[in-house]
């Protein structure tokens, strides 16, 4: 019974897929290999499971430890920022909350102003300077001269510890800058006047952000104009006059030093991103220099585009407070992102800590390598033991191997009778006997070569058929009836046997399969049961090769006084129903359908055209670049309503060797 699908028959691809799932008999060919494979597989599974579990534990522990360290790192950074913020904002708030000398612009009550700010700077070494901006444009600034940049900018005399800058007006109302230099004890020992540089505190971001407000605000980070250091400003309006703004510059060197010093691994990095994802502080000194070089005073930094990690985090921000794996190039990083909210400085920014996963897992990987080495040694020992054990029980295996080789040659005369106390060998013996019986059954109704190809392709599975594109070739001997009438049956059989031997050799050499010998006719087919992408070409080449061989055959016939066998060929390509049909006890592998009928009709049409090899347009369409054809027009084959394009096969475009002619079965 044909197995039907939506198109009527099972598709050839589905048949091949189902047969691909069947276990290969090569597993039964070597007990030694099978025994060794089973033992090795068991040991590998057990060892891999144990090593894998140990590695997973070590990996999880390493990642968990890294996450804890990252959280602790972020906590310490927040504490440092909190200390800087608290210390600075406390000084600014103190000055802004008391109705004191800062309510009047310089030069009034200069000593009181200097005393307060000098004391504040002395207590806060991270403060670069403290200043006051007035609504009139007056400005008062106390600078710590521990900074070499400030000493150079102000040309400070030796022994100066504090510089006091003030913007005042002379008697004519013209602005000028006064700079006072104080020693470490607070005594003034030098004074210098300079023309005003046009600085107006009222235009500065720190003044505009705090004026008329109540709470302290933070500005930056930015590169300080004089020192070039990374800094921020905390400013607040004076409570006595909200148009007077007190500001303090905070140097963030302690933060940058902390980031560069506190590293989880050699290549781990940490950096701070602003609200729009631009880096402002980085633990890597090279990256920090690029960041500093790309920004100006009071202006945020531009992102260095060549840093893949920063760009990846900007494009796909990881969730805050949760460690995430981030792929950058061919390296994976464990990344933690935490918002900075508890401190005034850098509030609204994010700190990012990233460590290469391979460095975090270095210890776990070392443990894995050690485990694999031990497991490998165990496997090697087990393989040796398995080989020794298999050698003791493989006496019968060689006999089974010989029997398998005989089956491969379709030798069914020698029985397979191997006895063994090993269950696997006994099972294999039974399986081979069943295989022998199955192949022998096939040999009852199809030639051995067809059986061999059918078994190799997996198409012999009982009564089944499917649609398959094939190239069919039919042949017939001209005037064979007359030849038979003039010869004895023995002579006819002898001539036909030699003739069919010739056909079998040439068809097999061109990857074809002889489906049937019917009288003096031959029905051969390509692309079934073995797939052949060049089936049409191979069929044409086969017909030409048979004609060439027949010349020698007929010469021998003439020399022996026997008749020549003039053979006609018909070749057609198309879809046919291919499979095994018949009764349960007698199956026949064949092809049916219009394709087969057309090939048979083409063979007969040679008489009308005076040709020997005719092919259809479907054949020409597939191999016109490899085979030479002569068009003969169109004609209707018997039993068909539509006309066919008829061509004579006259030769090949180029000669090919046997390998080019097709793939051996």
From Swiss-Prot:
Cofactor: Mg(2+)
Record's catalysed reaction(s): ATP = 3',5'-cyclic AMP + diphosphate
Record-linked Gene3D superfamilies: 6.10.340.10, Nucleotide cyclase, PAS domain
One of the GO BP terms on file: intracellular signal transduction
Keywords: ATP-binding, cAMP biosynthesis, Cell membrane, Lyase, Magnesium, Membrane, Metal-binding, Nucleotide-binding, Transmembrane, Transmembrane helix
Cofactor note text: Binds 1 Mg(2+) ion per subunit.
Stored InterPro entries: A/G_cyclase, Adenylyl/Guanylyl_Cyclase_3/4, dCache_1, HAMP_dom, Nucleotide_cyclase, Sensor-like_sf
EC number: 4.6.1.1
Main location: membrane
Places the protein is found: Cell membrane
Highest taxon listed in the record's lineage: Bacteria
Enzyme class: lyase
SUPFAM superfamilies to which the protein is assigned, alphabetical: Nucleotide cyclase (SSF55073), Sensory domain-like (SSF103190)
Residues holding Mg(2+): 476, 520
Keyword field contains Magnesium: yes
Cellular component, GO annotation: plasma membrane
Entry GO MF terms: adenylate cyclase activity; ATP binding; metal ion binding
UniProt biased composition (Basic and acidic residues): 7-24
Region Disordered, annotated ranges: 1-25
Reported function: Plays essential roles in regulation of cellular metabolism by catalyzing the synthesis of a second messenger, cAMP.
Identification of the protein by name: Adenylate cyclase 1
The encoding gene: cya1
